[in-house]
Amino acid sequence: LFNRGKSQAQPTPGVETLLGDRDGQLDSLKGRDWDVVIDNSGYVPRHVRLTTELLRERVRHYLFISTVAVYADLSAAGVTEDAPLKVLADPTVEEVRRDTYGGLKALCESVVRTDFDGRYTVVRPTYLVGPGDDTDRFTYWPWRMSQGGDMLAPGTPDDPIQYLDVRDLARFVIASAATPHRGVFNACSPPDGAR
């Protein structure tokens, strides 16, 4: 487990914790080999490149958690993994904002694909819900409807939405790490799963 040591008060039992930071403080990763790396915190291509360049010869399989926000157009149902991706007007931008998030993640994916050619898995989850979701974007709506009265909601009643329970994503990621699932995969509920 590689992190800055700031967000988890107690160490995870049985798991070695390596302290560092993606922005150049990677010394604790040097001189070690791994079967699989699961990268769930890559938001800026430069940071991902620092990691992949260091680990390229020391890791057999690099698994990168991306997002469906990389797609240029999500207005139609059935977006497949080969759909066009977002392109940033300025690919050197490093500020993660609503308008740069998807494009930055697409650039991060490109770094992983280049440095781990044939040895990578990119998982593109949709909206994640479940334990640990502090956004309240999923639980708010049933709660609000239970309050009764008029309410303003985005979209139209027939707009589809696809979400994914974080526990299902975790199972898929672990299965992908344990078996030779290579390539790019969307991770979401079935297209008719929620309306």
Predicted region positions:
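Conserved beta-loop-beta element that borders a ligand/cofactor-binding pocket
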Residues: 66, 108-131
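N-terminal Rossmann/SDR dinucleotide-binding element
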Residues: 1-39, 60, 108
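NAD(P)-cofactor binding segment of oxidoreductase domains
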Residues: 32-92, 107-111
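A conserved pocket-lining segment of Rossmann-fold NAD(P)-dependent short-chain dehydrogenase/reductase
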Residues: 93, 144-164, 186
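Flexible, glycine-rich beta-alpha linker
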Residues: 121-142, 159
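A conserved structural motif in NAD(P)-dependent oxidoreductases
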Residues: 162-169, 179
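Active-site YXXXK catalytic motif of short-chain dehydrogenase/reductase
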Residues: 101-105
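Mid/C-terminal beta-alpha module of Rossmann-like enzyme folds, strongest
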Residues: 172-195
